[in-house]
């Protein structure tokens, strides 16, 4: 498996040794390029997800989806982006202008920050701290603040009600989400995202294989809680159109609305990417202990494995959204506090016992 850190080391040596750049300038150039790469990747994946959502929705409803703009509707997303860019950005007269303008920025900052923790390949993780799981959950929580400020700052009763629903839902489901991540940390022995993936390299080393029953339970609870955390159907009570028009971003237009729309889709990918990283091996290929098979699998680039797993989980979550009816807010909270969180907590205890007694697959 190719180690992408070789490329970064070569580029650093190119700047400092070959071109003679001082260390501070080399670091600055590298940070700018990495930041630009994150934003480009963020935008490209958002475009793919928006197009994918429309097509998946259409096929589940026996339709074709967008077909007019470009071949097979491939340019529809770009047309929508152009339309959104040229729309006027207006602020409601009685809105709290500071909160109104800061809210979409907080939502997009939390989304981009969490996106930066995903390990794309061996040695290709932008933010790779030894407490990565902890920082990931902390940064992703910024979005909750942004959603609440959007509702409060809009001075709209529907937006406020939507923001309250969204905040209580996201805070509640973060409990189960974190418990599932702690379950994985107990088994792998590290909170570093790259370390979690490296612990899953080898025959039958993916976490759902190593940790068997408790790891599989944690995986499914994580997907359900993550779907609710991203405000996706059937947990999209914060944007219930029949009750709250457009939810907390009712009063937003242009790129203000675009930031919320963009963050929603990328949060879906982030949840899928974290699940793929923590439970399905991330960029690690599937190895079964047969030399010929494993050798072929190892030839496939790690980024292909990661994106394949992540987009497969995205498709599963989209399938769930367009299959199940929307839950009421009381049903959503009941599912979390009466079922998912006790199950995740019990599962954490079981995983602790499994690891302590050495009952996992080594």
Model-derived regions, located:
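Selective transmembrane helix interface/packing segments
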Residues: 1-362
């Amino acid at each position: 498996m190719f180690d992408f850190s070789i490329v970064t080391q070569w580029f650093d040596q190119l700047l400092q040794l070959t071109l003679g750049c001082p260390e501070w300038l080399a670091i600055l150039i590298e940070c700018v390029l990495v930041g630009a790469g994150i934003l480009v990747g963020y935008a490209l994946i958002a475009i793919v997800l928006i197009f994918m959502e429309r097509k998946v929705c259409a096929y589940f409803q026996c339709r074709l989806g967008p077909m007019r703009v470009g071949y097979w509707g491939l340019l529809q997303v770009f047309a929508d982006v152009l339309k959104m860019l040229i729309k006027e950005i207006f602020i409601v007269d009685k809105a709290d202008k500071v909160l109104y303008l800061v809210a979409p920025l907080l939502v997009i900052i939390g989304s981009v920050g969490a996106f930066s923790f995903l390990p794309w390949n061996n040695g290709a993780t932008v933010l790779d701290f030894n407490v990565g799981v902890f920082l990931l959950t902390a940064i992703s929580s910024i979005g909750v603040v942004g959603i609440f400020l959007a509702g409060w700052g809009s001075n709209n009763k529907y937006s406020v009600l939507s923001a309250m629903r969204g905040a209580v839902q996201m805070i509640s489901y973060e409990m189960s989400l974190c418990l599932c991540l702690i379950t994985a940390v107990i088994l792998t022995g590290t909170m570093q995202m790259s370390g979690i993936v490296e612990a899953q390299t080898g025959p039958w080393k993916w976490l759902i294989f190593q940790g068997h029953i408790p790891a599989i339970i944690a995986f499914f609870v994580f997907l359900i809680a993550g779907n609710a955390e991203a405000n996706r159907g059937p947990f999209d009570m914060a944007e219930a159109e029949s009750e709250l028009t457009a939810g907390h971003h009712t009063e937003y237009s242009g790129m203000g609305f675009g930031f919320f729309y963009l963050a929603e889709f990328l949060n879906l990918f982030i949840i899928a990417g974290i699940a793929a990283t923590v439970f399905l091996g991330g960029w690690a290929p599937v190895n079964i202990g047969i030399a010929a098979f494993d050798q072929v699998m190892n030839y496939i680039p790690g980024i292909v494995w990661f994106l394949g797993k992540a987009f497969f989980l995205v498709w599963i979550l989209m399938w769930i959204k367009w299959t199940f009816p929307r839950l009421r807010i009381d049903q959503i909270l009941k599912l979390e506090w009466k079922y998912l969180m006790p199950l995740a907590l019990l599962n954490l205890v079981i995983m602790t016992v499994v690891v302590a007694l050495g009952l996992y697959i080594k």
